[in-house]
Amino acid sequence: MYYFHKFNSFDYHIYVMSISLAVLILILLNIYISFKGFKDIIFFEKFHFNINSIKNGEYYRFISSGFLHVDNQHLLFNMITFYFFGDFVLNALGIFWFYILYIFCLLSGNIFCYLINYSKNNYSAVGASGAVTGILFSAILFYPDLQLALLFFPIPMPGYFFAIIYLAYTFYGIKKQNDGIGHTAHLGGAVGGILLSLFYNPNIVVSSFKTIILMIIVIFIGIVYFKKK
C-alpha cells in the first residue's frame, strides 16, 4: 500500500520515508517473533490466538498472537502497511501514545474477534492486522488530506473514501466468513483506532468531520447487514 499527498489538482507525489526508531522497533519485534513461530510449532501453538485456550485463562494470547503471522506474505503485508502509516501517527501522538494506540488496537481487534467467535472453541488466528488497521484509521483521521492507493489499484483516493470502502468490505467479509482473513480483528482494530484518536484529540471531530460521519454511517449499515439472516 502506498500513500500520497496531493500538492495540486494534477500532481501527486509518492513519499519515500525514513523510518523512526519507534516504528522500527515494532517491525523488528514482529519479524523476530513471527520467524520464531515459523520455525518452532510449539512456540506458535503456545502463543497464537485460540478461543478455547483463552476461555481457560490464557489471556496473554490477546497480545502475543498479534506478533505472530501465518507466513512471510502475511508478515510482509502488515509490516509494509505499518511502515507507511506508523510515522504519521507517531508524529501526531508522540511515542507514548503511539505505543498505547498500537497495543489498544491490537487488544480491541482480538477482543472483538473473541466476542464474535466465542462459540467456536477451535477458532484460531494470528497477526498484527488489528493494530495495523487501527494505525491506518488513526492516520486517516489525523491527516484528512491524505491520499491512499493500493498496490494492485494504484489510483489515489481520499482517505475518507478508502475508509468507507475498507469498512464495507470488512463487514462483508465478516458476514461471509469464507476467505480466511481476520475481518473481525480488522474491524475491532479500526474502531479502536478511531476511538483512541478521538480521545487523544477531540478536535479531529472538526477537522475530519465528514470522515467520521461517513464511518459511523457505514458501521451502522454494517451492523444491520451483519445481523440480517
Model feature map: region roles:
Residues Y2-K229:
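A detector for small-residue-rich transmembrane helices and their helix-helix packing motifs
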